[in-house]
From Swiss-Prot:
N(2)-acetyl-L-ornithine binds at residues 125, 265. It comes from Bacillus subtilis (strain 168). The modification N6-(pyridoxal phosphate)lysine is found at residue 237. Pathway: Amino-acid biosynthesis; L-arginine biosynthesis; N(2)-acetyl-L-ornithine from L-glutamate: step 4/4. Disulfide bonds: none annotated. Its main location: cytoplasm. Binds 1 pyridoxal phosphate per subunit. This is Acetylornithine aminotransferase. It is found in: Cytoplasm. It comes from the Bacteria. Its cofactor is pyridoxal 5'-phosphate. Its EC number is 2.6.1.11.
């Protein structure tokens, strides 16, 4: 009997080794990993530069608290500020914690309380994260929710009309590609309406880049595809290539809202995490690296569209190396079949197969994955005729 709370529906796979795009389980079986910790190991498992940076830091100092100066934090913050729309950075431990910090910052900086988010969004499982999330299923049994959140339809430029002259809006918070909501990209028209609404209401724009950031979509941050100017950006997942870390990035005019004692964390920004972040960002923010990731994403999408001609496949969508295959029915059996074939993927809702390979994936590995997907979908279609 397990001593763990049963909060996860775990597969019967125990990963013992991982390198690059491949993992090996307890039985010695090798899998092509197109999950990568759910968009975490963007440089692939156990990337040499990140591994060496963390090993080196292990022999120096791990943690001393944020009462002390931290040059590694400063270096990482400067990298994030140089490659984003923000100027100031707060380091934490996870995406949920980053989104909590963003919500606190927005309310404190504006003196207003209402936060606009969107249906099918996902912003975490803490109380502010749940309240911001536009999916009732994750809130069941945990009420009452934190107040002040209003939900609008995603990808509907006219949705803001429903708010009328409503004021006291601190921020609009959204993902430019909804991950847990089905790998659902926003349209340029919708995002333009979001930016205009924020300007009209003098509300802050918070972009949740937890899953889309750090090169995942072929840009440093997904909002760059649309010319947006966010006031606050949240990142985590790929930020440390597997080391737990998150960050809130904000414009300099928000600095007065976060002063000593207003917000904090014990472990956030510890030296081990910062070693991983600095090594990761040093690679990801190279222009050639991002262009290669974008090219690989385009190649993967082209291969999927060329090979997955089954009537069961309704749409292939996403950006960069964050793609979803929407199917005409549940995909759980296909995902299980793919595990048998040696390919790890995950769902994004009941009918969507989500693909999150590392940004270092090769074209041969992409071809291997597409071949397995084609085989599994064909088998599913034959069995369910």
């Amino acid at each position: 009997m397990s001593s763990l709370f049963q909060t996860y529906g775990r597969w019967d796979i125990d990963i013992k080794k991982a390198k690059g795009t491949y993992v090996e389980d307890q039985n010695g079986k090798t899998y092509l990993d197109f999950i990568q910790g759910i968009a975490v190991s963007n440089l692939g498992h156990c990337h040499e530069a990140v591994t060496e940076a963390v090993k080196k830091q292990l022999d120096s100092v791990w943690h001393v608290s944020n009462l002390f100066q931290n040059s590694l934090q400063e270096q990482a913050a400067q990298k994030l500020a140089a490659h984003s729309a923000g100027d100031l950075v707060f380091f934490c431990n996870s995406g949920a914690e980053a989104n909590e910090g963003a919500i606190k910052l927005a309310r404190k900086a504006t003196g207003k309380t209402k936060i606009i988010t969107f249906l099918q969004s996902f912003h975490g499982r803490t109380y502010a994260g749940m309240a911001a999330t536009g999916q009732d299923k994750i809130k069941t049994g945990f009420g009452p929710m934190l107040g002040g959140f209003h939900y609008l339809p995603y990808n509907d430029p006219s949705a803001f009309k429903a708010l009328g002259e409503e004021g006291d809006i601190a921020a609009v918070m959204l993902e430019t590609v909804q991950g847990e909501g089905g790998v659902n990209p926003a349209s340029a028209e919708f995002l333009s309406a979001v930016q205009s609404f924020c300007k009209e209401k003098q509300a802050l724009l918070i972009i949740d880049e937890i899953q889309t950031g750090i090169g995942r979509t072929g840009k440093g941050f997904a909002y760059e595809h649309f010319g947006l100017s966010p006031d606050i950006i949240t990142v985590a997942k790929g930020l440390g290539n597997g080391f737990p870390v998150g960050a809130v990035i904000g414009k300099k005019q928000l600095g007065e809202a976060f002063t000593p004692g207003s917000h904090g964390t014990t472990f956030g920004g510890n030296m081990l995490a910062m070693a991983a972040v600095n090594a990761t960002l040093q690679i990801v923010f190279q222009p050639d690296f991002l262009q290669e990731a974008a090219d690989k994403g385009a190649f993967l999408k082209e291969q999927l569209e060329a090979e997955l001609k089954s009537p069961f496949v309704k749409q292939i969508r996403g950006k960069g190396l964050m793609l979803g295959i929407e199917c005409d029915g549940p995909v759980a059996d296909i995902i299980a079949e793919l595990q048998t074939l040696g390919l790890l993927v995950l769902p994004a809702g009941p009918n969507v197969i989500r693909l999150l390979p590392p940004l270092t994936v090769t074209k041969d590995e992409i071809a291997e994955a597409v071949s397995k997907l084609k085989q599994a979908i064909a088998h599913h279609s034959a069995v369910n005729q």
